[in-house]
């Protein structure tokens, strides 16, 4: 089982590396207008036109490798892979939502893609189906908090929807500079691979390692200067995948710390908007806490200082800083669980 899982990761890595140049070349040959830039970070303007929707490639590779390996293992006497298929299902559902959003922006020239309400409705439907086909049959209606069950009853459905939709959008916000989201998710997935291994949930481990391999292959083309971006098709799917894995492993709360980067990025946006509206109402003029949100843009424009102007950070500096925070959060969780 473990050997097959490792092989799956290696195959995903190789296939993604081999397939991505054809995807990029397709963009160039068809003269498709890629990523649009409407940001105040001037150094990002040079990225306009970079091929996007690269998540289509690594999602399909990871899904194909996972499905084939799960099928082969099952017919050769291995366990059932219900959890694998459930997680794969929500990955593809959210990937499809992201694909539709990207497609409308890039090919139909609809700047906003799906409206916020359309996207939210589709995400909620995807989360609800995941609950009905995977969570509800298990009879679970409680959160596992340090080994103690917190029974939520009917509110557990609301939690599932909030968790999946919330982290899907959180990873989407994180995907704002070259390589940040891809390696942040790799760190999170590797942490959950340890938890899955300890729990002997090799069905979950299989899809985790397959996706890690595909993401590392994608990073070869996504690190600065990026030759391709993952797009909403990739980021929405990855966020939903992390939420689904945490639910399946009964370690939901750990995602708040393992995914501290996504939480920080989302919190910065919420704080910025709330504070701006509050100060505008109180003082007649909106004020900001951060130079720009999500948080990675704040770092780019002047480092950690809030209102004072500091030295601008390069994308690599921002990447390594936030990757380090994600790694520390992951190590903290493993220490809490197993030391």
From Swiss-Prot:
<protein>
    <recommendedName>
        <fullName>Phospho-N-acetylmuramoyl-pentapeptide-transferase</fullName>
        <ecNumber>2.7.8.13</ecNumber>
    </recommendedName>
</protein>
<keyword id="KW-0131">Cell cycle</keyword>
<dbReference type="GO" id="GO:0008360">
    <property type="term" value="P:regulation of cell shape"/>
</dbReference>
<keyword id="KW-0472">Membrane</keyword>
<keyword id="KW-0133">Cell shape</keyword>
<dbReference type="GO" id="GO:0071555">
    <property type="term" value="P:cell wall organization"/>
</dbReference>
<feature type="transmembrane region" description="Helical">
    <location>
        <begin position="202"/>
        <end position="222"/>
    </location>
</feature>
<dbReference type="InterPro" id="IPR000715">
    <property type="entry name" value="Glycosyl_transferase_4"/>
</dbReference>
<keyword id="KW-0479">Metal-binding</keyword>
<dbReference type="GO" id="GO:0009252">
    <property type="term" value="P:peptidoglycan biosynthetic process"/>
</dbReference>
<keyword id="KW-1133">Transmembrane helix</keyword>
<dbReference type="InterPro" id="IPR003524">
    <property type="entry name" value="PNAcMuramoyl-5peptid_Trfase"/>
</dbReference>
<comment type="function">
    <text>Catalyzes the initial step of the lipid cycle reactions in the biosynthesis of the cell wall peptidoglycan: transfers peptidoglycan precursor phospho-MurNAc-pentapeptide from UDP-MurNAc-pentapeptide onto the lipid carrier undecaprenyl phosphate, yielding undecaprenyl-pyrophosphoryl-MurNAc-pentapeptide, known as lipid I.</text>
</comment>
<keyword id="KW-1003">Cell membrane</keyword>
<dbReference type="Pfam" id="PF00953">
    <property type="entry name" value="Glycos_transf_4"/>
</dbReference>
<dbReference type="GO" id="GO:0008963">
    <property type="term" value="F:phospho-N-acetylmuramoyl-pentapeptide-transferase activity"/>
</dbReference>
<keyword id="KW-0573">Peptidoglycan synthesis</keyword>
<feature type="transmembrane region" description="Helical">
    <location>
        <begin position="113"/>
        <end position="133"/>
    </location>
</feature>
<feature type="transmembrane region" description="Helical">
    <location>
        <begin position="228"/>
        <end position="248"/>
    </location>
</feature>
<dbReference type="Pfam" id="PF10555">
    <property type="entry name" value="MraY_sig1"/>
</dbReference>
<keyword id="KW-0132">Cell division</keyword>
<feature type="transmembrane region" description="Helical">
    <location>
        <begin position="318"/>
        <end position="338"/>
    </location>
</feature>
<comment type="pathway">
    <text>Cell wall biogenesis; peptidoglycan biosynthesis.</text>
</comment>
<feature type="transmembrane region" description="Helical">
    <location>
        <begin position="80"/>
        <end position="100"/>
    </location>
</feature>
<dbReference type="GO" id="GO:0051301">
    <property type="term" value="P:cell division"/>
</dbReference>
<feature type="transmembrane region" description="Helical">
    <location>
        <begin position="53"/>
        <end position="73"/>
    </location>
</feature>
<comment type="similarity">
    <text>Belongs to the glycosyltransferase 4 family. MraY subfamily.</text>
</comment>
<feature type="transmembrane region" description="Helical">
    <location>
        <begin position="4"/>
        <end position="24"/>
    </location>
</feature>
<keyword id="KW-0460">Magnesium</keyword>
<feature type="transmembrane region" description="Helical">
    <location>
        <begin position="145"/>
        <end position="165"/>
    </location>
</feature>
<dbReference type="GO" id="GO:0046872">
    <property type="term" value="F:metal ion binding"/>
</dbReference>
<dbReference type="InterPro" id="IPR018480">
    <property type="entry name" value="PNAcMuramoyl-5peptid_Trfase_CS"/>
</dbReference>
<keyword id="KW-0808">Transferase</keyword>
<dbReference type="GO" id="GO:0005886">
    <property type="term" value="C:plasma membrane"/>
</dbReference>
<feature type="transmembrane region" description="Helical">
    <location>
        <begin position="176"/>
        <end position="196"/>
    </location>
</feature>
<feature type="transmembrane region" description="Helical">
    <location>
        <begin position="253"/>
        <end position="273"/>
    </location>
</feature>
<keyword id="KW-0812">Transmembrane</keyword>
<keyword id="KW-0961">Cell wall biogenesis/degradation</keyword>
């Amino acid at each position: 089982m473990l050997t097959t899982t490792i092989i799956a990761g290696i195959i995903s890595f190789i296939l993604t590396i081999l397939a991505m140049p054809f995807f990029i070349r397709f963009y160039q040959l068809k003269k498709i207008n890629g990523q649009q830039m409407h940001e105040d970070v001037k150094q990002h303007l040079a990225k306009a036109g970079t091929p996007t929707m690269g998540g289509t490639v690594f999602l399909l590779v990871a899904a194909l490798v996972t499905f084939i390996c799960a099928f082969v293992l099952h017919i050769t006497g291995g366990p059932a892979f219900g959890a694998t298929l459930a997680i794969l299902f929500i990955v593809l559902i959210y990937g499809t939502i992201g694909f539709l959003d990207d497609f409308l922006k890039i090919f139909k020239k609809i700047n906003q893609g799906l409206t916020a309400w359309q996207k939210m409705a589709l995400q909620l439907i995807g989360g609800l189906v995941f609950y009905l086909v995977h969570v509800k049959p298990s009879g679970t209606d409680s959160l596992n908090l340090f080994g103690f069950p917190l029974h939520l009853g009917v509110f557990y459905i609301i939690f599932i929807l909030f968790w999946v939709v919330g982290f899907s959008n959180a990873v989407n916000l994180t995907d704002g500079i070259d390589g940040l989201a891809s390696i942040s998710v790799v760190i999170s997935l590797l942490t959950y691979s340890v938890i899955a291994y300890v729990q002997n949930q090799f069905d979950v481990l299989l899809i985790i390692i397959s996706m890690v391999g595909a993401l590392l292959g994608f990073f070869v083309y996504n690190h600065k200067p990026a030759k391709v971006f993952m797009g909403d098709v990739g980021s929405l799917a990855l966020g939903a995948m992390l939420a689904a894995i945490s639910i399946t492993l009964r370690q939901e709360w750990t995602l708040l710390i393992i995914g501290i980067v996504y939480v920080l990025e989302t919190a910065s946006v919420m704080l910025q908007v709330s504070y701006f509206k509050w100060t505008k109402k109180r003082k007649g003029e909106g004020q900001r806490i951060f130079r720009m949100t999500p948080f990675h843009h704040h770092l780019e424009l002047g480092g950690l200082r809030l209102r004072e102007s500091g030295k601008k950070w390069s994308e690599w500096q921002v990447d390594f800083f936030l990757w380090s925070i994600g790694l520390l959060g992951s190590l903290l969780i493993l220490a809490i669980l197993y030391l």
